[in-house]
């Protein structure tokens, strides 16, 4: 799992 990608996605959602 790409945590960096997940963090980026969460940032976009926020």
Swiss-Prot record:
It comes from the Eukaryota. Keywords: Amidation, Antibiotic, Antimicrobial, Chemotaxis, Immunity, Innate immunity, Membrane, Secreted, Target cell membrane, Target membrane. Changing residue 9 to P: Decrease in both antitumor activity and content of alpha-helix conformation. It is found in: Secreted; Target cell membrane. Coiled coil: none annotated. The keyword rRNA processing does not apply. The keyword Membrane applies. GO terms for cellular component: extracellular region; membrane; other organism cell membrane. Expressed by the venom gland. The modification Leucine amide is found at residue 14. One of its GO terms (biological process) is defense response to Gram-positive bacterium. Belongs to the MCD family. Mastoparan subfamily. Negative results: causes no or weak hemolysis to rat and mice erythrocytes and has no mast cell degranulation activity at physiological concentrations. The analog MPI-1, which has a C-terminal thioamide (CS-NH2) instead of the C-terminal amide (CO-NH2), suppress the growth of sarcoma xenograft tumors (S180) with a higher potency than the wild-type peptide. Also has a higher hemolytic activity, a remarkable improved stability to enzymatic degradation, a higher hydrophobicity, and a higher ability to bind protein. Surprisingly, this analog has a lower ability to kill mice than the wild-type peptide when intraperitoneally injected. Antimicrobial and chemotactic peptide for polymorphonucleated leukocytes (PMNL). Potent antimicrobial peptide against Gram-positive bacteria B.subtilis CCT 2576 (MIC=4 ug/ml), and S.aureus ATCC 6538 (MIC=15 ug/ml) and Gram-negative bacteria E.coli ATCC 25922 (MIC=8 ug/ml) and P.aeruginosa ATCC 15422 (MIC=8 ug/ml). Has low cytotoxicity to normal (non-cancer) cells. Exhibits preferential interaction with anionic lipid vesicles over zwitterionic ones, which is further impaired by the presence of cholesterol. This is Polybia-mastoparan-I. It comes from Polybia paulista (Neotropical social wasp).
């Amino acid at each position: 799992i790409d945590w960096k990608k997940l963090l980026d996605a969460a940032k976009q959602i926020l």
